[in-house]
């Protein structure tokens, strides 16, 4: 019998996290810090949307961002629109870290692509992209 969507997605999440944890190595950065760094757009992001994007509560995000700030990878600044709102922005060192993370992610992508039968590569790529769009739509529908 084939696996249900839930079983496949659960296994996929675990396996994908395992690959990323093993293959992405950034000195002195935890996996959660790497995920946060890779999520912060170049223009910055407010704390609440960042917490939602990486799937943690605001208090956990605050501690995580404090550690990133202590490492010199981000700055926390008051939003110009509302001084009560905190924005997280990458420093130059944080931008460099983000570039390094992207390079390491690209290497993982290349390894996976090479592991897929040449004939099936486009189909696999399109299926992953389709799944990604479904997840984005689900996330947007929940706001």
Report residues per predicted region:
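Terminal interaction helix/tail motif
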Residues: 103-143
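Canonical helix-turn-helix DNA-binding module
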Residues: 43-95
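N-terminal leader segment of winged-helix/HTH proteins
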Residues: 1-27
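Residues in the recognition helix of alpha-helical DNA-binding motifs
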Residues: 12, 64, 127
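A cross-family signal for key residues in well-ordered alpha-helices
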Residues: 35-38, 99, 125-126
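N-terminal helix-turn-helix DNA-binding core of bacterial DNA-binding proteins
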Residues: 18-60
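Short helix-coil-helix linker/hinge
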Residues: 27-32, 91, 116-121
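A structural signal for well-ordered alpha-helices, especially hydrophobic packing surfaces
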Residues: 13, 44, 98, 132-139
